[in-house]
Amino acid sequence: MLRNSVITPTPPAKNLASFVTKPTTDIMGYHDNTTRLSNRIDDIETWRETLEKTLADVDEEIRKLEEDKDLAERALEAKALPLDVASECKTLRDGRRDNDVVDDLANSEVGKEIDVIEGIKDALQAKVSSAFEQLCLLQEARQQLHADLRDKTEAKKIDTYCHDLTISSPDICYQPNSTRTPKGSTTPQTWEDFSRYNKDRADAEMRSSQRLREAIHSTVAQTDNDLEAQRQATEFALRKRIHEMKRAKDEDEWQKKNTEEEIAKQERNIRELEQAIKDKENPLKLAMTRLENRTYRPNVELCRDNAQYGLVNEVHEIQDSIKALEKKLQDAHNARDACEKQLYRINKDLELKNNSLDLDNKCMQVREKLTTGPVTQTMNNLSTFKTDRELYTAQRSLLA
């Protein structure tokens, strides 16, 4: 019976040795993969630190760009008053009349000032729009960094958990198909390239933002200088025109005074000539009466004697004198009429000069707003804004 029984042979000694050494191999694999997980955690943490710093830099750049965008917007708003003032000056000067409606230097500078302000507003608006677009790009880069950082934080959490698992951990168990390659898996190079791209993109957008902020400050400063230079040019032209108008007005007033004196003189002449002519009437009547009466002398007594010749000569002399006086009287009337016409033209010109002078003086009064009030307050706000920003930067440096 025993002979015929099936007896299971004992494993050879060599096979037993392989079974005995297998756990050692498993332990080595466990340690190797734990090391690999540790290295992977270090890699993730390195990128996390890099991305966190980049994210903080992006946040700071966004803050700075928002401040500079506000600066440009305030500078843009501050141009409303100069434009209103320049437009009001143009409207006032359009109130000039007749011969005073000339395209003088003041008119040219006021028109140029409006063009300069419009150009400044366009330049500042372009910078505001560029800042808005750049903020959108920075926000996109920030969101990508934040998403990448969030994923890496989650990946680190998972890998840290895996790293801390041991063969004695209660959470370990068999998993179905654990060696599968999950959908969407990437290579280490792709993983690194993705984060590097996010960082490089953020760095590029920050560089663009820094250049834009420099351009904003340069534009604000340059436009302020351009506006101030044009303001001075316009006001110089207006003051010069006011000076010229005052001189012209003084000349008109001097001519008016002389003309009025000449009119008074001619009117005195007219009165004197009229009186002189009147004074000739009775002597003429007398001489004519004598001549007429002597025509009634009878017969041979109607003699053309010396008295007759003397009376005839007297009548002729008086008549000639009256004609000369009447000629002078007419000349005096003509001179007075010419003076009155001249006086009318002078008064008309004075009215125009006074109107133009009044309008230009109103322009200068309106332009006082540019050196007091809202504009000054705006510049104070901009200075305060700059001071606050420098204070914030200093505080950040101290905290760092």
Curated annotation (Swiss-Prot):
Main location as per UniProt: cytoplasm
A GO BP annotation: cilium assembly
Coiled-coil boundaries: 35-81, 236-294, 310-353
Domain of life of the organism encoding this protein: Eukaryota
InterPro entries cross-referenced by the UniProt entry: Tektin-like, Tektins
Tissue specificity: Cilia and flagella.
Subcellular location: Cytoplasm; Cytoplasm, Cytoskeleton
One GO CC term, this protein: microtubule cytoskeleton
Keywords: Coiled coil, Cytoplasm, Cytoskeleton, Microtubule
Keyword Cytoplasm: yes
Pfam families found in the cross-reference section: Tektin
Cysteine pairings via disulfide bonds: none
Homology family: Belongs to the tektin family.
Subunit structure: May form a heterodimer with tektin a or exist as a homodimer.
Record function comment: Structural component of ciliary and flagellar microtubules.
Name of the protein described by the UniProt record: Tektin-B1
Lineage: Eukaryota, Metazoa, Echinodermata, Eleutherozoa, Echinozoa
